[in-house]
A protein has these predicted regions:
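Short loop/turn segments that flank or connect secondary-structure elements
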Residues: 1-273
Length: 273
């Protein structure tokens, strides 16, 4: 039995999946979690619903720990983005461009790995309450000001969250190989051993499953980036078809949120969890 976190659904529940081949690559098999992609999760940062992953720091959201960089391309994109930030965009620009910089050495999976520097308890790119430019990720806010997708300026792990992509080569019975890409929810377990210790995490909280659109639509740019345009178009068509038929394994957090939002016949809201 999985550990229960107050206000969140359990980690283990039924999910529906679909597998299809990349229209542009017959050796690329994509497995997509329809339960997650058809959920109504949405980012609730900056609202009372966001409690933060670290107790006592709700204004950090999920930015308390800094972001590990995935590769050289990830760092190059971040470096280019930093060059576009001004003092009006980034509260700690003087610190980030100072002697200690905006990156620091750490370890990931037992190997050396750069991550964004923590400053005053959170990622150095996180603008805090009271900053004239507003709270939140300086990179994200700058992208919106420029009219570009945030994924073009933020580290990979930041713009992909809470989409989890994993890949592995698998050998079929005839000894041929295909690359299998799995697209699913980045839940607490995605954070590793420390995931269970997070003060709060949004994907399991019904209060974050109040989006106007399902995840496959609200995260269309991100999914297109990780899968490619044609593969995403195929996935989106399948999601729309599945939604029309009725999903069997609805995400439990979405189900609770919808139940709360549906009045009973006498106009009284149903009880929560």
């Amino acid at each position: 039995m999985t550990e229960v976190h107050p206000g969140e659904v359990e980690l283990d529940f039924a999910r529906e999946w679909v597998e299809f081949y990349d229209p542009e690559d017959a050796t690329h098999l994509i497995a997509a979690d329809m339960t997650w992609l058809l959920s109504r999760w949405t980012c609730v940062f900056g609202t009372p619903a966001c409690k933060g992953t670290v107790e006592g720091r709700p204004d950090d959201g999920c930015c308390s720990h800094g972001a590990f960089l995935s590769d050289d391309d990830d760092r190059a994109r971040l470096d280019d983005a930093v060059k576009q930030l001004t003092d009006e965009d980034w509260q700690f620009r003087d610190k980030g461009l100072g002697r200690k910089g905006y990156l620091e050495d750490d370890e990931y999976d037992g190997k050396p790995n750069l991550r964004t520097r923590k400053y005053k308890g959170a990622c150095i790119f996180l603008n805090r309450p009271g900053f004239a430019g507003g709270i939140g990720c300086a990179l994200h806010s700058k992208a919106l000001k420029l009219g570009v997708e945030p994924l073009t300026m933020k580290p990979d792990v930041c713009w992909q969250l809470p989409i989890r992509r994993s890949q592995e080569w698998i050998t079929r019975p005839d000894d041929t190989q295909v690359l299998r890409t799995v697209i699913t929810e980045y839940d607490r377990r995605g954070w590793g051993e420390g995931g269970a210790d997070l003060h709060w995490y949004c994907t399991g909280d019904p209060n974050a499953h109040v989006g106007a659109r399902p995840v496959f639509e609200s995260y269309a740019p991100e999914l297109t980036e990780v899968l490619g345009e044609k593969a995403y178009a195929e996935l989106a068509a399948m999601c729309r078809r599945r939604s029309g038929l009725g999903l069997v394994a609805v995400h439990p957090a979405t189900r609770v949120a919808e139940h709360r939002a549906t009045p009973t016949s006498n106009g009284v809201q149903p009880s929560s969890l």
